[in-house]
A protein has these predicted regions:
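Conserved "landmark" site that anchors the functional core of diverse proteins
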Residues: 1-155
Length: 155
């Protein structure tokens, strides 16, 4: 319903601790979003980025390893260009959504893909001088030590 979509875009969500490669739960103050008349939805194809509403009316954004079908109501879909931002948002950070047209989404995607394709040209190897590395001891430079003089029983 339109009223639920308007409420959704006006709500400030918090990235929950619950999240993995399957999806990210979002928390917010107040009552859950109404799924009136939508809880009898047959299972259908799910897209990465779909925003499902749980039985309690809480949003859950589906990520790269989400299920392929589902029957929960969905209020929208996060565009592919924004999914990396959402997936990497630390727990406790505020998130908000806005509805955009298909044309706007396609323009954002085109710009996103252009930036990704230009990365190869812009990226340079990082060469660091160990003398100037203040965090050198933080690196695991060896994974174990053995003695060349030890017998197989001692090592």
């Amino acid at each position: 319903p339109r009223s639920q979509c308007e409420r959704f875009t006006k709500t400030t969500f918090i990235r929950s601790l619950r999240g993995n490669r399957m999806g990210v739960a979002l928390e917010f103050e107040g009552d859950g979003f109404s799924a009136e008349g939508q809880l009898n939805i047959l299972s259908e194809i799910i897209s990465v980025g779909d925003i499902q509403m749980t039985g309690e009316g809480r949003p859950f954004v589906l990520l790269q390893e989400c299920q392929t079908t589902g029957g929960y109501p969905r209020i929208g879909t996060v565009i592919p260009a924004d999914l990396p931002k959402l997936a990497q948002t630390p727990p406790g950070i505020e998130i908000s959504f806005q509805m955009i047209t298909l044309k706007e989404a396609l323009n954002v995607q085109k710009s996103f893909e252009k930036n990704i394709n230009e990365l190869r040209r812009r990226v340079r190897p990082l060469i660091r001088d160990p003398i100037t590395m203040t965090n050198l001891l933080a690196y695991q430079l060896i994974s174990g030590a053995i003695s060349a003089n030890a017998t197989s029983e001692e090592s």
